[in-house]
């Protein structure tokens, strides 16, 4: 959810110079630029320049859809398509399920294939994954920037995360 409705690359004056190309916007990008009520991503900043640290799946997320940009969900569907084509059955376990249920959600599985960008994690997620690996589970890491930033799920509101980027690393804003 960290990238949900991200628009920072459209609000950055120097992005085209950094990327050496013109910005291309999909209709959903144009819509998000004019409809702030759908919220920002944790890569965006508020109008006062402070970073957005909270995101939620409990809102329309317009950049998380099939046939969108080859990023996140769309890239992950390449993995599921490959598994289907190869005749392998699979289940999808979300980060939120791993956070809430820990190692128990992975019990019974021999192999875990990560998504293409497993960047954000909680202590509970890492503990569950580590316990499962210690029990003999095997993991295929198919991503980049994996296990990079720490997040916290809201205790009373499922689907809400907070991300404070205080450690060293590449980021669009620095947490206080």
Question: PLM ranges: what are they?
Answer:
Residues 149-176:
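Extended catalytic-interface subdomain
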Residues 20, 141-142, 167-171:
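Short, surface-exposed, polar/charged, turn-prone segments marking secondary-structure boundaries
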Residues 9, 20, 112, 131-133, ...:
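Short, low-complexity, polar/charged sequence segments that are solvent-exposed and flexible
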Residues 68-155:
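Helical hinge/lid and interdomain linker segments adjacent to catalytic or ligand-binding clefts
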């Amino acid at each position: 959810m960290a990238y949900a409705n991200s628009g920072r690359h459209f609000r950055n004056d120097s992005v085209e110079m950094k990327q050496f190309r013109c910005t291309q916007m999909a209709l959903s990008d144009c819509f998000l630029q004019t409809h702030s009520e759908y919220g920002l991503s944790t890569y965006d900043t508020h109008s006062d320049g402070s970073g957005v640290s909270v995101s939620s799946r409990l809102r329309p997320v317009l950049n998380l859809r099939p046939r969108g940009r080859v990023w996140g969900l769309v890239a992950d569907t390449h993995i599921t398509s490959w598994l289907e084509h190869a005749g392998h059955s699979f289940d999808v376990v979300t980060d939120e399920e791993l956070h809430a249920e820990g190692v128990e959600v992975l019990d019974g599985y021999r192999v875990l294939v990560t998504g293409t960008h497993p960047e954000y994690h909680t202590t509970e997620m890492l503990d569950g994954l580590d316990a499962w690996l210690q029990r003999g589970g095997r993991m295929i890491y198919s991503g980049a920037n994996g296990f990079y930033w720490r997040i916290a799920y809201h205790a009373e509101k499922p689907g809400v995360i907070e991300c404070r980027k205080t450690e060293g690393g590449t980021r669009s804003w620095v947490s206080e």
